[in-house]
Structure formats: structure tokens, C-alpha cells
Amino acid sequence: MTQSLVISIDAMGGDHGPSVVVPAAARAARDLPHVRFLLHGDEAAVRAEVARCAGLAERTEVRHADRVIGMDEKPAQALRRGKGTSMWGAVEAIREGDAHVAVSAGNTGALMAISKLILRMSADLDRPALVASIPHAKGVTTFLDVGANVDCDAERLVEFAIMGEAYHRAAHGVAKPTVGLLNVGSEEMKGHEEVREANRILREGGFDLEYRGFVEGDDLTKGSVDVVVTDGFTGNVALKAMEGAARFMYGELRAALTAGPFSSLGALLARPSLLRFRERMSPPPAAPLLGLNGLVLKCHGGAGDREFAKAIRAAADVAQSGFASEIERNMRRLPAALSPAAPSPADGAA
């Protein structure tokens, strides 16, 4: 982009607040010369951090927020007291046209509720979904929902498939992404009622999707399909299990390579490769909330400045991807696919 891109950031969100968020903005700014920042939070604290980062002040506007939404607040509480908080300000800047995309490391449920209230849903969608990018040998798998919606009926899963396919097409340049529905087996009769009904709708609904049916957990890292769809409960558990496994493997590998003098010498020689391995296995820096009339990304609450800088770079990429129009085009087919006149599930599917 030749014109300036504005990223609105909740500077108080997450476990560390401005002491991490502001240096992260400075780190990301070095790679994003066309980006400006709106930082929302306690003005004195944020400005003090900005002053420590050379060159950041010229590209940053600080907007004062009196309050912060706690990481343990319920979404209903966050909505009641949201105005005047740093998270509210970061999202509201999108609606007001002051920024192109918002980033927060704050409370996930609160961010979803506030974003939905302020920005509203697009194209008759019901709920936003959090999406993650899972690395595999051939590229990445787009995985959703990873925590925004614990309970999902068949219609929600179909919406997620449409959103995920459009996102993968725009974000990763794949002309016709393949889509799979996460299940406990690939057979048609497997799984609970909601996932079987979603499978039927996706097969018979006339969507412009390359739908491949059910996939299993190991398909996430095999690259069997481009997009894997599930409910937020299952997705969040799977994502965190993969993150934990990656940390365990890296720790064990590092311990084995430093167990003795000769292996330590080998570890020193292998250090660049080990760092690349750790980078490759690191969890995604941020998860976009898909389906809103505006772009919002959720960063890990415990992210350090390096991880938050990655989230900011991801926000810049998403803001330039243009996937919203792809979602809207396929959503027009959804009401007909959900019609009672549509064929019923095959007999014996249990």
C-alpha cells in the first residue's frame, strides 16, 4: 500500500500492558514504513513508553482511556463497563474510520462481545470466529474456531467454513482452498448431530467451496486440506495442545543437545537451525476475528514484545487481504441451504 495504514492498539491489554505493547509497536514499525499507530490506554504510562522508543512518537497518536478490562471479567460485565476502556477505544476507532484494523491482547470473550456490539456482524453472520494458522510441511492450515464460540450448531459451523475459506484464499493466495470438518473419524456416520448436519449442508447447499468432508486431528499438521472447521471449545483445546507439544519438543531437543560437552558443541553449531525450528513451531502470533464489519485481531495475553510485534505485522497483512467480499458472496447461498425443503440426513446416521 502506498497510503498510510493505521493500526489501532489496546495498549493496556494482556499480561504486560504498555511495557510490552509499545516496544512491540516500535519493533513492527521498522518493517512497516507505511503504518501509523493509535495507542489506547493510560496516557502518561503509554507516552512514557513511547518516549523510550526512538522514532515511534512521530508515527503514533495516544488516546487516553480511564479503565482497563480485566482478563477475568465476563463478557456481560465488559459490555456494561466497556466505554472508556482501552479495548473499547481500540475497536471504536475502526467504526469511526480512524483506523483500518485493531489489535488487543486482552480478554478474549470481552473482545468478541465489544467488537460485535461496536462493529456489528457482516453479511447476516451470527457470530465472529477466531482463526489460527497451523504450520505444516507444505504451508499452513487455517483453523477455526479456536475459542470465540464454545457451543456451535450446524449453521454456525457452515458459516465458519465460508469465513475460513474466504480468509485462506485472501491471506495465503490459494485460488480454491479445500475445506474439511473436524470429526472423530472420516466416515459419514461418525460424530455428533451438529457436525453431521453441517456436513450435509456443506455437501448439498450449493456453496462455491471445495469441500472434502470430515477430517481428523492429525490432518491439521498433515496439510490434507487448507481449512479445518470446528467449534470453539474443540479448537481451543486442540490449539493449546499443539502449542504445549511444540514447547515440549523444543525443550527436550535442547536438553538432549546440551547434555554433555560434545553434544553442546554440536548444539552451538546447530543453533541457527534450532532457532529456525523454534520459530517454525511457535504458535500463531494473533487470531483474526472473522465475520465483523471491521478487522480485529486477538493476540496471546502472555505475548512478549517479539510476539506482539508479529501480531501487528499480521494485522497489517490482514488489513490488505480483502477477504470480506469473498465471505459475503458465499453467505448469500446460506439461507437456501438451510431451508426445511433441503434433503434430510441419510437414514442410519448415528
From Swiss-Prot:
Record's keyword annotation contains Lipid metabolism: yes
Pathway in which this enzyme or protein is active: Lipid metabolism; phospholipid metabolism
EC numbers on record: 2.3.1.274
Single biological process term from Gene Ontology: phospholipid biosynthetic process
Protein name per the record: Phosphate acyltransferase
Top EC group: transferase
Cell compartments where the protein resides: Cytoplasm
Keyword Lipid biosynthesis carried by entry: yes
InterPro entries given in the database record: FA_synthesis, Phospholipid_synth_PlsX-like
Record key words, sorted: Cytoplasm, Lipid biosynthesis, Lipid metabolism, Phospholipid biosynthesis, Phospholipid metabolism, Transferase
Main location: cytoplasm
Family: Belongs to the PlsX family.
Disulfide bridge map: none
Catalytic activity: a fatty acyl-[ACP] + phosphate = an acyl phosphate + holo-[ACP]
Gene name in the database record: plsX
Any single GO CC term annotated in Swiss-Prot or TrEMBL for this entry: cytoplasm
Subunit comment: Homodimer. Probably interacts with PlsY.
Biological role: Catalyzes the reversible formation of acyl-phosphate (acyl-PO(4)) from acyl-[acyl-carrier-protein] (acyl-ACP). This enzyme utilizes acyl-ACP as fatty acyl donor, but not acyl-CoA.
GO MF assignments: phosphate:acyl-[acyl carrier protein] acyltransferase activity
